């Protein structure tokens, strides 16, 4: 597909590409989402939990009295690290040249095509920062590789042309205990560009609190000069070019989507679905559409009454593709779990690889991304279009 709107929908949520550099900040405390469950048997393989090791690392960094690390500590550590680098550079003036490879990516969670200049693209990696292209993706240049935080997770552009991006991930980790580890790191709030083309970005000082260190999703209102941010702390509405913020919902928010009329949808960390009502409040959908785990959302650009949900269970297994054709009043399960539709694989990576997108000109055609790639339409049903081989799990 070459249609710009579809590319924006699908590429902006893709979890399989990114950047190769890595900067991480220190969490203020050991998040509940990073705790690893008890040891479980998966077939003939037994996996050991690393919760003890994680606790040990955290305990060495915490305040002995409060048991936490204050956000200010992170800022101070960044300043000290920069000073050390400058001192070492002055003493040993070495010149480095990048030798490559330069075509290896990691994981992109933020993607944006400039609303007024289609050749200007932005891509944000969870460990490499924000990159910009003025050639429709043929070449890229880093924007923020010297800024405070390179954990870019979401990006949006308002109708006024201002571009905002958020940092820090909200604990994407397999909670079952059968796959140890977590890729999530805290961020440093929001950044914005007001030059009209996204050449430079500055930190928004009103987002330095811990509430803005885990920015999971961001969408701009299609008609009004405002945007919404979904964090581990809730949903925030930003107006006045980002200068004014209002919390409109609480809880862990994993994904936000907004339709062409400005109606906001959200999914929570526990699989609940929220929709904005006429008064601007977020209301929970019927419990029957709760998938139990991470859920991705897609709204048809053609018809906002058509909304799709692709869910993962609490263990990360595929729990189904659901659709409403009446704006959420009723729901139908289009695809159920089976050995054929197991799009998240035997590793149950629905907590990690989970994206769904609607074709911009066909509200009955959706693209489903997990470990594998599939489509669903009202004529052919579920069809797998690409997959990965299911290699044996290395327990060593």
Go through each PLM region and give its residues.
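Extracellular glycan-interacting surfaces
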Residues: 3-396
């Amino acid at each position: 597909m070459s249609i710009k709107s579809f590319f924006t929908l699908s590429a902006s949520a893709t979890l399989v590409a990114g950047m190769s550099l890595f900067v991480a900040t220190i969490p203020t405390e050991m998040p509940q989402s990073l705790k690893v469950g008890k040891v479980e048997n998966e077939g003939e393989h037994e996996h050991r939990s690393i919760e003890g090791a994680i606790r040990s690392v955290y305990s060495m960094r915490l305040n002995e009295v409060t048991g936490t690390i204050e956000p200010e500590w992170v800022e101070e550590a960044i300043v000290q690290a920069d000073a050390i680098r400058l001192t070492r550079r002055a003493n040993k003036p070495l010149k480095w040249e990048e030798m490559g490879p330069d075509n290896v990516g990691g994981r992109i969670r933020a993607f944006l095509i400039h609303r007024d200049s289609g050749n200007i693209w932005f891509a944000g990696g969870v460990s490499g920062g924000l990159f910009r292209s003025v050639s429709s993706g043929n070449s890229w240049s880093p924007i923020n590789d010297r800024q405070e935080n390179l954990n870019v997770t979401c990006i949006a552009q308002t109708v006024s042309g201002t571009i905002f991006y958020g940092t820090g991930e909200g604990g994407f980790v397999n909670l079952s205990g059968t796959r140890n580890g977590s890729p999530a790191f805290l961020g440093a709030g929001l950044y914005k560009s007001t030059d009209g083309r996204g050449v430079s970005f500055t930190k928004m000082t009103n987002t330095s609190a811990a509430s803005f260190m885990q920015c999971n999703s961001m969408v701009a209102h299609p008609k009004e000069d405002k945007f919404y941010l979904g964090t581990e702390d809730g949903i925030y509405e930003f107006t006045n070019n980002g200068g004014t913020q209002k919390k409109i919902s609480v809880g862990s928010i994993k994904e936000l989507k907004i339709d062409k009329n400005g109606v906001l949808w959200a999914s929570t960390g526990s699989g609940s679905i929220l929709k904005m009502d006429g008064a601007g409040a977020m209301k929970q959908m019927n419990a029957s559409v709760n998938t139990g785990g991470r859920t991705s959302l897609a709204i048809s650009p053609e018809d906002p009454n058509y909304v799709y949900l692709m869910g993962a269970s609490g263990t990360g297994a595929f729990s189904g593709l659901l659709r409403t054709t009446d704006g959420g009043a009723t729901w139908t399960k289009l695809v159920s779990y089976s050995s054929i539709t197991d799009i998240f694989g035997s590793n149950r990576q629905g907590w990690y690889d989970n994206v769904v997108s609607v074709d911009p000109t066909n509200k009955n055609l959706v693209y489903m991304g997990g470990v594998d790639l599939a489509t669903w339409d009202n004529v052919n049903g579920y069809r797998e279009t690409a997959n990965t081989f299911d290699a044996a799990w290395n327990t060593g």
